[in-house]
């Protein structure tokens, strides 16, 4: 039946993309939870899809492997950070914008819960730790590019430098928070580090503002 001819509106591209994003998020959350409960090696793909209430072939539309499902979650805060940078107001200092975007990307309590679970799974495997380092390098580049896009072309190298310094300090602090087993919010650890970064790069922040 032609739904359009019968007067039934077809789903908009935005609706389809949101549905795909929800499915991907459901799979990553189910994967991380099961990895934490049962162990990474012990968890099977069909167990992940059952927990996410999708069929196994759906999993492979989004991920090539269990590793991709585990690290796929890290794309969510990266994407949120990039989106937040695009939305920051013109005239704002580049460091202020970067820090605000990082904080906004993990503000939800669910995000922090998944970060904690994911961190614990990865900490048990040197191989997964190596993969995390590679993922973080890629994400740092993506965030730096998003920041540079809001600055004059001559500031591209500065954007790379500041992003590398701030995100590395931020990620290291997140790792400390996960390892500590602290029950308090992640911001108890990250806020002082980001405040220090803001002071260190105060002159850069004043010199380079968003366009």
Language model region names:
Residues 27, 65-70, 80-81:
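Short amphipathic alpha-helical segment with a characteristic S/N-K-E followed by hydrophobic residues
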Residues 41-42, 67-68, 76:
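Residue-level preference for short helical/loop micro-motifs built around acidic side chains
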Residues 111, 137-162, 180:
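Hydrophobic alpha-helical bundle segments that form small-molecule/ligand-binding pockets
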Residues 159-167, 171, 191:
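Short, well-structured alpha-helical segments
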Residues 1-38, 42-54, 80:
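Basic, helix-initiating cap at the start of DNA-binding domains
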Residues 1-10, 145, 149, 179-211:
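C-terminal peripheral helix-coil segments that are non-catalytic and often amphipathic
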Residues 54-63:
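Short hydrophobic/aromatic patch on the recognition helix
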Residues 79-118, 124:
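Hydrophobic alpha-helical connector segments
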């Amino acid at each position: 039946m032609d739904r359009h001819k019968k007067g039934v509106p077809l789903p908009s591209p935005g609706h389809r993309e949101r549905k795909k994003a929800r499915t991907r998020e459901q799979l990553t959350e189910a994967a991380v939870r099961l990895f934490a409960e049962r162990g990474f090696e012990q968890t099977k793909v069909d167990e992940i899809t059952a927990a996410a209430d999708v069929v196994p072939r759906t999993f492979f539309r989004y991920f090539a492997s269990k590793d991709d499902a585990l690290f796929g979650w890290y794309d969510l805060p990266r994407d949120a950070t990039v989106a937040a940078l695009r939305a920051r107001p013109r005239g704002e200092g580049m460091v202020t914008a970067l820090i605000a975007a990082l904080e906004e990307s993990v503000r939800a309590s669910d995000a922090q819960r998944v970060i904690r679970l994911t961190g614990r799974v990865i900490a048990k495997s040197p191989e997964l730790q190596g993969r995390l380092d590679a993922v973080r390098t890629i994400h740092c580049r993506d965030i730096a590019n998003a920041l540079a896009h809001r600055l004059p072309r001559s500031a591209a190298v500065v954007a790379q430098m500041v992003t590398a310094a701030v995100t590395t300090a931020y990620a290291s602090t997140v790792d400390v928070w996960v390892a500590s087993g602290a029950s308090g919010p992640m911001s108890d650890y990250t806020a002082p580090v980001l405040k220090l970064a803001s002071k260190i790069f105060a002159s850069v922040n004043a010199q380079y503002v968003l366009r």
